[in-house]
Amino acid sequence: MMAEEGNRNKSTSTIEKPERRLMFKQLTRRVGVAVVGSIFGSALLRSRPAPAATVLRPPGALAEKDFQSACVRCGLCVEDCPFDILKLASWADPAPMGTPFFTARDEPCRMCQDIPCVRACPTGALNPLLTDIRKADMGVAVLVDHETCLNYKGLNCSICVRVCPIRGEAISLKPIQNERGLLQIPTVDSTKCTGCGTCEKHCVLSEAAIRVLPRELGLGVSGANSAGRTPVWK
């Protein structure tokens, strides 16, 4: 009797030990994966390039440094955008993670008269004093590529002028004489342009010749183009 019980205990112990070893091995593997994942994730975030200077923010956004400090990444402005233009940046986007931005070439700001994104912001990162969408300053449109713009080739394209929400004020065609003759060149009035991106969205070229850039950068590019220098954003 005693011998049988001893054999049973020995048999049970023999079965339990491999199970415990398997559980320990699985636990060790999971911990290892978690540690490696954490290290890899941290390294990935550290290796991310600095946020691009070409990111476009919602209407009423404060200056970029102040905006990043005030924005709590709540996503309320994104939720309240009726056209789903705004999105929150992921780690792969050219903006700090969780901050709202839009890509004009994909979808421009529709310039809602009631500016719901501004009203939704709880912190003032989108300035509540902005009540007239025509006073928004999301950026400025710049003709960044004279070589591909159809008007510089002597053709008559006026798409960017015709689709502009502030038609006849923010962008117009100005006559310029060159070896090809009298050209009608898209010209942006930076004091009237809101940076909505409608012109960039509707440019008929595969890569838009006109782009919307944050105002400081855009004015620098415009000045470089006028002086015949290489645009600073390229």
Swiss-Prot record:
It holds the Pfam family Fer4_7. [4Fe-4S] cluster 4 binds at residues 193, 196, 199, 203. GO terms for molecular function: 4 iron, 4 sulfur cluster binding; metal ion binding. [4Fe-4S] cluster 2 binds at residues 109, 112, 117, 121. [4Fe-4S] cluster 3 binds at residues 149, 157, 160, 164. Keywords: 4Fe-4S, Electron transport, Iron, Iron-sulfur, Metal-binding, Repeat, Transport. [4Fe-4S] cluster 1 binds at residues 71, 74, 77, 81. Residues 61-91, 98-131, 140-176, 184-215 form the 4Fe-4S ferredoxin-type domain. The keyword Metal-binding applies. The keyword Iron applies. Pathway: One-carbon metabolism; methylamine degradation. Involved in electron transfer. This is Methylamine utilization ferredoxin-type protein MauM. It comes from Methylobacillus flagellatus (strain ATCC 51484 / DSM 6875 / VKM B-1610 / KT). The lineage of its organism: Bacteria, Pseudomonadati, Pseudomonadota, Betaproteobacteria, Nitrosomonadales.
